Amino acid sequence: MDPVPDLPESQGSFQELWETVSYPPLETLSLPTVNEPTGSWVATGDMFLLDQDLSGTFDDKIFDIPIEPVPTNEVNPPPTTVPVTTDYPGSYELELRFQKSGTAKSVTSTYSETLNKLYCQLAKTSPIEVRVSKEPPKGAILRATAVYKKTEHVADVVRRCPHHQNEDSVEHRSHLIRVEGSQLAQYFEDPYTKRQSVTVPYEPPQPGSEMTTILLSYMCNSSCMGGMNRRPILTILTLETEGLVLGRRCFEVRICACPGRDRKTEEESRQKTQPKKRKVTPNTSSSKRKKSHSSGEEEDNREVFHFEVYGRERYEFLKKINDGLELLEKESKSKNKDSGMVPSSGKKLKSN
């Protein structure tokens, strides 16, 4: 083998090396014959083409690779909406009923019809009866969702507090509402709003009953820091089929240590704040009334007004003022009556 000559480091060195390389002429190359199974070669100018139909062996769709859509900022998620909290019985006349358990301190769950509010203990079962006027479509479900009641909190997602979440080991430990007594319960979290809900298939009532009972439990107290933090919540119970809402009912929920006591306290507070209903005589137009000035003053004095007072001390103070004014009015009327007594002789009677 001849030694490689030392070439100068320049642009022309590669050209000189390439010219020294020898290769056989094209005529000496062996090409496939016509009888070979691979096909025949046909000379066309300076090119050799294989004269064979490859349609049976060549997949012409090999380059038809589906193009996956690339996510861009122009693709927006579906719009989020504020949950509806108004009742909607729908064509199936959805109704909810709660067991009557009173306000005893020993009850674990009680419902106030006056306040449309459920009071229950932490992780205690609350039976809720569901009634419809006709059989829903096959595959219908009942969905329970918790939302905050007040407008300033409605955008926040209702979740359990970190303390109670860490004590639990189930996959849906962040969910506030759970369905008990059913292996078919499913827990969901909306990918856009992050709101959580639990569903259970609708089951027709048992023979001899008009109601279907579901068992709900609430896994966090209303006063838990880092969770509800004393913010009132609502439970939205919907009857759905394939994403379509057939009916909706809402009620407020308070999770506390003593449901009976809290229900009694809030109902009494509601009664105190509501003014007593009085019969009001319709008044005619003043232009049509022909009364004396004195009779008009008497009518004004008989008119009753109501206003709310906060605080027992302030109420007692205003009550004393009102009692004093009524006493002065009574004494004034008594004096006017005595001074107005005149005998038949025209002489004024002396008052004792």
Swiss-Prot record:
Residue numbers spanned by region Basic (repression of DNA-binding): 334-350
SUPFAM superfamilies recorded: p53 tetramerization domain, p53-like transcription factors
Site residues by UniProt (Interaction with DNA): K105
Broad class of where this protein is predominantly found: cytoplasm
Entry's localization field: Cytoplasm; Nucleus
Region annotation Interaction with DNA: where it falls in the sequence: 254-261
Note on domains (UniProt): The N-terminal and C-terminal disordered regions undergo liquid-liquid phase separation (LLPS) following homotetramerization and activation. Post-translational modifications, such as phosphorylation or lactylation affect the ability to undergo LLPS.
Protein name in the entry: Cellular tumor antigen p53
Subunit note: Binds DNA as a homotetramer.
Organism per entry: Oryzias latipes
Motif (Nuclear export signal): 316-327
Region (Transcription activation (acidic)): 1-48
GO cellular component entries: cytoplasm; mitochondrion; nucleus
Family per record: Belongs to the p53 family.
Pfam short name (any one): P53
Residues given in the record as Zn(2+) binding sites: C161, H164, C220, C224
Cofactor note: Binds 1 zinc ion per subunit.
DNA-binding region: 87-273
Placement of sequence motif Bipartite nuclear localization signal: 276-291
Region Disordered, residue ranges: 262-303, 330-352
InterPro entries reported in the protein's UniProt record: p53-like_TF_DNA-bd_sf, p53/RUNT-type_TF_DNA-bd_sf, p53_DNA-bd, p53_tetramer_sf, p53_tetrameristn, p53_tumour_suppressor
GO MF, one example: promoter-specific chromatin binding
